[in-house]
């Protein structure tokens, strides 16, 4: 969903393009905490409280504009001449996106994926403790909160659970590290 939208914002001209980009930027200025009460009322009206959707829908609503904004700026750095050469050879816009633009944008896609993942992971705690009171729907960050009692904290168990939750993320970051560095440094030098 983010890739075609970011590509359209980077390459196409359409009505209300700047207005919708400004709206995306405005959405990024608000955190989930500011909109908790309205989100709670909407989710309650839709009957989505105490479900997985109670965490997925607000997270997607906040993170898709972030992903579009970040990826659009990366796609604008890719030379248009490469796409024009593909069009001259008879390629369609979708084929050009898939075979020309996306391979060049892979470092940017990885950076956007990691940024969106970190945002989702951070918001997950807030949305989980607000919109889900059922234990089986609680994600790891909210589950770690269970180790904090009224009088004491069971540090040993909490640290073991935190390490178990962080290890898969660390392994993914280790494998994607070269793409992350390439994507972060791609716009650092002016040519």
Regions found by a protein language model. Give the residues of each.
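A hydrophobic, multi-pass inner-membrane permease signature
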Residues: 1-191
